[in-house]
């Protein structure tokens, strides 16, 4: 919980002849101490002053919102609890290396008999910090170097430069983060970036240079993100053997898009949850603010988790999405959906389901995927705790489909097309949870419903990532 120091109302001498207390008085002293303890726990108190010590470049008015709740405490237990909650809020701001709390009796001419002073002793982060770490994406690893200027203007602002080098993607970017005073979850971010990625399943390479702005707005139980992105995209062939369909997509495009994301997440963990649910809905509209990409895109994710006996967890998930071109121009290969691989429909190659040309997968305009999973602790564990708690056995059933749509037809024809030629798979394996960062899966898969052109992985398949079906 951190350190909360509560100084006593009086200084009590220790027992012993040399310390001025006779052993005959010990019973009286014990009775006095019990009385004092009862007074501390049950008597009404008033928090008269809340002080913050150790501030350098941080503005005091910015922190006032985080500590104001301490003044509402009415007894010592509430003071300690609300002080701890305020300490957690101060640490959450990301501008302090350490925060300690000291609770003491009020002193001075205006001190009340039951008055308390609460002092937060803070240690600010350095003006310039650096970091080095590794990240795991969807079946991809990367090394990340970062330079950060925390609390740049004294009210929680943050300027970050980050360079990432991965197995399929290299990027660097500069971002500025500004939270709202008193409401850290409500914040504004501006990003400048360049990303170069390789997509071997499509024989495609893509370089994006762009700018984006994001506004995060928590509302009741939901988190909302409003975003505008302007990006200059350069598409090219990854190999000389790239199909004509991919070569036809090569060149430069400009994309200007507005998007909105709503998230409801009650899971106890994002990596390997035991309970709770997730609902994520994302809409993207491109073309109305400029650029030559014109489409409306919708993407939905739903996940339910329920814990059963012996620590087993049953999980069900459903993904779905559709992209609708606005105007006569077809959608770009960079904007379509992709399906298949160890993080979605297991037993198939990475993004190797659906429309393709000469072995290059072109993505689809509509898709759905569902999964049913049973996670259990490792059998024959000698005791709880330790390394074994990071592992789970995994039984799964996955299904899905992806296709292009004829928008001249009605919704019934679209649903019928998505219900045809369903790919599905089942299998079992082992999962390793890497803290709250990522998870690794090693599964033995049995792909079924394989269609012509699909790339399968019949047998052992390894997956690493954050988002799994």
Swiss-Prot record:
<keyword id="KW-1134">Transmembrane beta strand</keyword>
<dbReference type="GO" id="GO:0033108">
    <property type="term" value="P:mitochondrial respiratory chain complex assembly"/>
</dbReference>
<dbReference type="GO" id="GO:0045040">
    <property type="term" value="P:protein insertion into mitochondrial outer membrane"/>
</dbReference>
<feature type="domain" description="POTRA">
    <location>
        <begin position="45"/>
        <end position="125"/>
    </location>
</feature>
<keyword id="KW-0472">Membrane</keyword>
<comment type="subunit">
    <text>Associates with the mitochondrial contact site and cristae organizing system (MICOS) complex (also known as MINOS or MitOS complex).</text>
</comment>
<dbReference type="GO" id="GO:0005741">
    <property type="term" value="C:mitochondrial outer membrane"/>
</dbReference>
<dbReference type="Pfam" id="PF01103">
    <property type="entry name" value="Omp85"/>
</dbReference>
<dbReference type="InterPro" id="IPR039910">
    <property type="entry name" value="D15-like"/>
</dbReference>
<keyword id="KW-0812">Transmembrane</keyword>
<keyword id="KW-1000">Mitochondrion outer membrane</keyword>
<dbReference type="GO" id="GO:0042407">
    <property type="term" value="P:cristae formation"/>
</dbReference>
<comment type="function">
    <text>May play a role in the maintenance of the structure of mitochondrial cristae.</text>
</comment>
<comment type="similarity">
    <text>Belongs to the SAM50/omp85 family.</text>
</comment>
<protein>
    <recommendedName>
        <fullName>Sorting and assembly machinery component 50 homolog B</fullName>
    </recommendedName>
</protein>
<keyword id="KW-0496">Mitochondrion</keyword>
<dbReference type="InterPro" id="IPR000184">
    <property type="entry name" value="Bac_surfAg_D15"/>
</dbReference>
<dbReference type="InterPro" id="IPR034746">
    <property type="entry name" value="POTRA"/>
</dbReference>
């Amino acid at each position: 919980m951190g350190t909360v120091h509560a100084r006593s109302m009086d200084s009590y001498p220790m027992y012993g002849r040399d310390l001025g207390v006779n052993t005959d008085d010990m019973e009286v002293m014990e009775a006095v101490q019990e009385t004092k303890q009862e007074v501390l726990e049950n008597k009404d108190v008033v928090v008269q002053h809340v002080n913050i010590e150790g501030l350098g470049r941080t503005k005091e008015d910015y922190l006032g919102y985080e500590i104001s709740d301490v003044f509402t405490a009415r007894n010592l237990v509430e003071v300690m609890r609300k002080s701890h909650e305020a300490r957690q809020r101060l640490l959450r701001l990301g501008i302090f290396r350490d925060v300690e709390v000291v609770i003491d009796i009020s002193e001075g001419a205006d001190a009340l008999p039951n008055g308390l002073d609460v002092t937060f002793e803070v240690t600010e982060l350095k003006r310039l910090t650096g970091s080095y770490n590794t990240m795991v994406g969807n079946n991809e690893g990367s090394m990340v170097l970062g330079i950060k200027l925390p609390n740049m203007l004294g009210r929680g602002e943050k300027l970050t430069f980050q360079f990432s080098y991965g197995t399929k993607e290299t990027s660097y970017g500069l971002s500025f983060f500004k939270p709202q005073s008193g409401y850290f979850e409500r914040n504004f971010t501006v990003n400048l970036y360049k990303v170069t990625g390789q997509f071997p399943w499509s024989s495609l390479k893509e370089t994006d240079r762009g700018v984006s702005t994001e506004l995060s707005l928590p509302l009741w139980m939901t988190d909302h993100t409003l975003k505008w992105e302007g990006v200059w995209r350069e598409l090219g062939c990854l190999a000389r053997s790239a199909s004509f369909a991919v070569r036809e997509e090569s060149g430069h495009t400009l994309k200007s898009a507005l998007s909105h994301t709503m998230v409801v997440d009650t899971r106890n963990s994002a990596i390997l949850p035991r309970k709770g649910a997730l609902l994520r809905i994302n809409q993207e509209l491109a073309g109305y603010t400029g650029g030559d990409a014109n489409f409306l895109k919708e993407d939905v994710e739903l996940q339910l988790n329920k814990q059963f006996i012996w620590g087993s967890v049953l999980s069900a998930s459903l993904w779905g999405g559709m992209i609708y071109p606005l105007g006569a121009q077809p959608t770009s290969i960079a904007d379509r959906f992709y399906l298949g691989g160890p993080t979605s429909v297991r037993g198939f190659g990475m993004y190797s389901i659906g429309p393709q040309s000469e072995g290059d997968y072109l993505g689809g305009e509509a898709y759905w995927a569902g999964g049913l999973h049973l996670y259990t602790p490792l059998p024959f564990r000698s005791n709880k705790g330790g390394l074994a708690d990071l592992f789970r056995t995994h039984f799964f059933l996955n299904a899905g489909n992806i296709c292009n749509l004829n928008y001249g037809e009605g919704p019934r024809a679209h649903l019928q097309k998505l219900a045809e030629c369903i790919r599905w798979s089942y299998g079992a394996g082992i999962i390793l949870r890497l803290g709250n960062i990522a998870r690794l899966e090693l599964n033995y898969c049995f792909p079924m419903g394989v269609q012509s052109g699909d790339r399968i992985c019949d047998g052992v398949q390894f997956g690493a990532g954050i988002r799994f079906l």
